[in-house]
Amino acid sequence: MNAWEVNFDGLVGLTHHYAGLSFGNEASTRHRFQVSNPRLAAKQGLLKMKKLADAGFPQAVIPPHERPFIPVLRQLGFRGSDEQVLEKVARQAPHWLSSVSSASPMWVANAATIAPSADTLDGKVHLTVANLNNKFHRSLEAPVTESLLKAIFNDEEKFSVHSALPQVALLGDEGAANHNRLGGHYGEPGMQLFVYGREEGNDTRPSRYPARQTREASEAVARLNQVNPQQVIFAQQNPDVIDQGVFHNDVIAVSNRQVLFCHQQAFARQSQLLANLRARVNGFMAIEVPATQVFVSDAVSTYLFNSQLLSRDDGSMVLVLPQECREHAGVWRYLNELLAADNPISELKVFDLRESMANGGGPACLRLRVVLTEEERRAVNPAVMMNDTLFNALNDWVDRYYRDRLTAADLADPQLLREGREALDTLTQLLDLGSVYPFQREGGGNG
């Protein structure tokens, strides 16, 4: 059956700021306390969406979350009106204010793990929301992510959206950032590669930075998504690269159809994994980047592998990269050698995503891949699909509501909270989502 990969990109939120909240993500730590530009960040993301849509790659948008997220501050014991809660937390515990104001939901590669209908036992598309248990600021995302996905994939005959796994470290799940699918045409059954960093009883794990994904979580997600057990491989990420800042697998590997583009040191027991994939995926091709050509540290600083690998109708592929790759002489030299070599990659597309990159999120972090048949695509909420009209409407919306300068101190401004809620209220109407945010259901609630 014919099917296409649709990239659902996260729209950067109004409170995009640099707080260094993500230990193990070296860009996040390095840019802590710098001044951010939320308006520019949102426009950089929108431009990537539009240019890819114009190039023939189906593209859609996932909205940001409500931030600052007052309900969690109330859970932490701060009382009063919303304005009083903001004032108290800014004075008494500003780190909590930064956490509940994080715009991290823009990295929708962590929103959920997807199983296309060709891979599932019941023939539906399955989406399991990630619990993002390893980081407090990200663990807040799951309930609203679930509401958003249910509003976008709202046909229950074709889509099953599953709640996140229980919020415990044993079941730490980071979504599609630790998941790849390999195979032939998108509509054919594929091999799902789940990548984990640790498992109970296995001492092979990183020592400097946390392994956020567990094997136990990956196995549970595969069950929830009803993936045919014959179409699943579980593999461990190399703990040494996690300790060098590879906090998700999509920082060291990316797949598309029959191709796996990865670093030579991406996986534990890599040669064994690649042999398994060759045996189980027709036409499998591994493009392994030698450590002698690109150090892991350079892969992390440029986000070479946090790229998008996209298929054209003729079978050739486009590699979508952040500008940092072009600015690194060694990485750019390797990429041009890759273009000249015998493989499906025939074009490099480079985007300026500096605002997101400074927080540790490249092109692949910003998108959730969903393989859909034509019938399934028609069942998706049409208002989220990127086209000229939506692009112009979203740019106008960003111009109207987003600030062009934000510091940690600005998060305590009650006007920022009001701006954010008004913006999201308008956005849910624009995207025909209904009331997906807690403030819409509760009327903003004082107390």
Curated annotation (Swiss-Prot):
GO terms for molecular function: N-succinylarginine dihydrolase activity. One of its GO terms (biological process) is arginine catabolic process to succinate. It catalyses: N(2)-succinyl-L-arginine + 2 H2O + 2 H(+) = N(2)-succinyl-L-ornithine + 2 NH4(+) + CO2. Keywords: Arginine metabolism, Hydrolase. The keyword Cell membrane does not apply. The active site is at 174, 248, 365 (nucleophile). Gene3D superfamilies: Succinylarginine dihydrolase. Its EC number is 3.5.3.23. Belongs to the succinylarginine dihydrolase family. Catalyzes the hydrolysis of N(2)-succinylarginine into N(2)-succinylornithine, ammonia and CO(2). NCBIfam families: arg_catab_astB, PRK13281.1. This is N-succinylarginine dihydrolase. It comes from Escherichia coli O1:K1 / APEC.
